Amino acid sequence: MMSHIVAPSVLSADFGNLQRDIEMINSSEADWFHVDVMDGLFVPNISFGFPVLKVLQKYAKKPLDVHLMIEDPDRYTQAFKDAGAQTLTVHIEASRHLHRNIQNIKAAGMKAGVALNPHTNIHLLDDIICDIDLVCVMSVNPGFGGQKFIENTFAKVIALKKLLTEKNSKALIEIDGGVDLNNYHKLLVSGADVLVAGNTVFASENPVNTIKQLKLKQI
């Protein structure tokens, strides 16, 4: 059985020392780089775009898991492929033609993910669940790092795992927002496959050790 994936969120890195933080993730037990792209429209915050992606593409030695919190994401599918994205996740709430969007992501040679805001029902995925590689469950309201974890996420993950099994989907369940050393084990038990961790990693005294702890499977 595959071990769970830990994906530090670059949004929480020190952008004055970005290359240092990239090297830290490279040297750690982390599996992916999680990259949040925000446009100030779909979410209130603006993060970063292609220049930062190009830096990550140049120095990162692990896959780039790019999470688009932007309106009409299909406009940029090829551009994100060119910037190094290996997985491209779009929000179901922001994509007018989700099936076509997923097809275009896969045609460009990337893995396709769909993200759900905290209020969004998992059954909106029924008709697309077998076409995607990842479901990103937002466990905070999207747009800002460092928010408090929404407790209902556990029940949502359990229900989503059941749906994936019923539909015979191989999609991974990714949790994004408020993941820490106190809740990560319960998330794994609930059915999570990928843990996105921002402040928990980058605000800790020893980020490499924190990542190591997040990789542990408690008995």
How would you label these PLM feature ranges?
Residues M1-T89, A94-H97, N104-A107, K111-A112, ...:
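Conserved N-terminal beta1-alpha1 strand-loop-helix module at the mouth
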Residues G178-S190:
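Acidic, divalent-metal-coordinating active-site segment for phosphoryl/phosphodiester hydrolysis
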Residues V140-P142:
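Short glycine-rich anion-binding loops that position phosphate/pyrophosphate groups of nucleotides
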Residues I175-V179, V196-T200:
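Glycine-rich beta-strand-to-loop/alpha-helix junction loops that act as flexible
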Residues H34, E174-I175:
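Generic enzyme active-site microenvironment
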Residues H119-N121, D180:
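Short acidic loop-to-helix transition motifs that present clustered carboxylates
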